[in-house]
Amino acid sequence: MSSADFNFGDFTTTYTSPTIPAYPDTLGQLQPIQPNPQAAYPPVSQHHASHHVQHPHQPGYVLSNPPQLSGNKRKASDAMSVPPTPGARVMSFEEASRLAAEEDKRKRNTAASARFRIKKKQREQALEKSAKEMSEKVTQLEGRIQALETENKWLKGLVTEKHGSKEDILKLLREFSAHAAKVSKDAAAAAADKAEAAADKADAERAREESSFCVSTSSPSSDESVDTDNKKRRKD
């Protein structure tokens, strides 16, 4: 099937419109916007090209003075490519263990300081509570002392009103002290008598024991004399 079957025209010819003017084809004579890269930049030498094989760049852009980063990167890559020695692995393990020990020590110190702060706070609270209780007890005792002093004054007043002046009270006090001294003296004498009687009794018991001991030691000799007499009589 071809275009002739559908009665289509020939599209290879240029279409010309009577209303649109024709423009000349001068696009091939236009100058390029960017100049020739080979003319703008110097050619790359073989020495620089060998250094920049691993770093491709856009065509026509060559650095006249390459930076020093390439050498540093190469050294870093070489250092990373070298496998670590066993000593380095041991040092790294020791370093890791040391860091772990320091971290554990730091945590334990933190926990200990927290416990110390808690105990200190509890101790301070207990001391404050005990101080408050002691102050309350002191206040109560002071009130009791004042009440006792008031009662003592009241009793003194009653005694002076009943027995007269202070001289009578002093006389009664002297009599009471004399009676108390006499009672204590009698008690001391009775105690001395009891002690002397107990000592005499102990001496008597000791003498009795000594006499019984002497009798028991002398009895075997008399028995022996009796036995010897009986033996002599039998021989005769």
Swiss-Prot record:
Changing R106Q: Loss of DNA-binding. SUPFAM superfamilies: Leucine zipper domain. Induction: By sulfur deprivation. Residues 141-155 are annotated as: Leucine-zipper. Belongs to the bZIP family. GCN4 subfamily. PANTHER family: ACTIVATING TRANSCRIPTION FACTOR ATF 4/5, CRYPTOCEPHAL, ISOFORM A. It is found in: Nucleus. Residues 26-89, 189-236 are annotated as: Disordered. Residues 28-37 have a biased composition (Polar residues). Binds DNA as a dimer. It holds the Pfam family bZIP_2. This is Regulatory protein cys-3. Keywords: Activator, DNA-binding, Nucleus, Stress response, Transcription, Transcription regulation. InterPro entries: bZIP, bZIP_sf. One of its GO terms (cellular component) is nucleus. Turns on the expression of structural genes which encode sulfur-catabolic enzymes. Binds to sequence elements upstream of these genes. One of its GO terms (molecular function) is DNA-binding transcription factor activity. Residues 212-223 have a biased composition (Low complexity). Residues 193-211 have a biased composition (Basic and acidic residues). Residues 99-162 form the bZIP domain. Residues 105-137 are annotated as: Basic motif.
